[in-house]
């Protein structure tokens, strides 16, 4: 009985390996050592070299000072460019054309417009029916 279980387990593992290997795309399949060496040498020549340098404390301080100067200068420019804004006028107690005018809202601003409601008074808007009133 143990031999049968061992055989079935081996068969199951081999089938799992076969299905996983057959579903790999061609570029994911393992290659031989020669092709790997050729690809790695070509990749090294194609990519640009990158050098990483550590910053010392002095250069960090200089960059922080430069950043603070930039912040200060931008704040000064922003404060100089501020212009007195005109006061916003209170909106008139009316609804502009094509805006919502549901019943508790005031009347339409345009004398030729009227409030039209659709879909059981759920969507209402001010519309101009005729240009000549």
Swiss-Prot record:
Subcellular location, record wording: Secreted
Keywords: Disulfide bond, Glycoprotein, Knottin, Secreted, Signal
Annotated GO biological process: hormone-mediated signaling pathway; melanin biosynthetic process; melanosome organization
Signal peptide range in chain numbering: 1-22
Comp. bias intervals (Basic and acidic residues): 26-36
Disordered: annotated segments: 26-83
GO cellular component: extracellular space
SMART domains the UniProt entry points to: Agouti
Molecular function terms, GO-annotated: melanocortin receptor binding; neuropeptide hormone activity
One Pfam family cited in the UniProt record for this chain: Agouti
Gene3D superfamilies in the record: Agouti domain
Residue positions the entry lists as glycosylated: 38-39
UniProt keyword Secreted present: yes
InterPro entries: Agouti, Agouti_dom, Agouti_dom_sf
Disulfide bonds: 94-109, 101-115, 108-126, 112-133, 117-124
Domain spans labelled Agouti: 94-133
Function in brief: Involved in the regulation of melanogenesis. The binding of ASP to MC1R precludes alpha-MSH initiated signaling and thus blocks production of cAMP, leading to a down-regulation of eumelanogenesis (brown/black pigment) and thus increasing synthesis of pheomelanin (yellow/red pigment).
Domain description: The presence of a 'disulfide through disulfide knot' structurally defines this protein as a knottin.
Record protein name field: Agouti-signaling protein
Organism the protein comes from: Equus caballus (Horse)
């Amino acid at each position: 009985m143990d031999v049968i279980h061992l055989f079935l387990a081996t068969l199951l593992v081999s089938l799992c390996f076969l299905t996983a290997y057959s579903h790999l795309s061609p570029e994911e399949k393992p290659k031989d050592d020669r092709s790997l060496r050729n690809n790695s040498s070509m990749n090294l020549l194609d990519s640009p070299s990158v050098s990483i340098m550590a910053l010392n404390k002095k250069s960090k301080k200089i960059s922080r000072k430069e950043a603070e100067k930039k912040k200060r200068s931008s704040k000064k420019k922003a404060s100089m460019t501020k212009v007195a804004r005109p006061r916003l006028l209170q909106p008139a107690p009316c609804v502009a054309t094509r805006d919502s005018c549901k019943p508790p809202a005031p009347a339409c601003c345009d004398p030729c417009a009227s409030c039209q409601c659709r879909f059981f008074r759920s969507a209402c808007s001010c519309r101009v029916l005729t240009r000549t009133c």
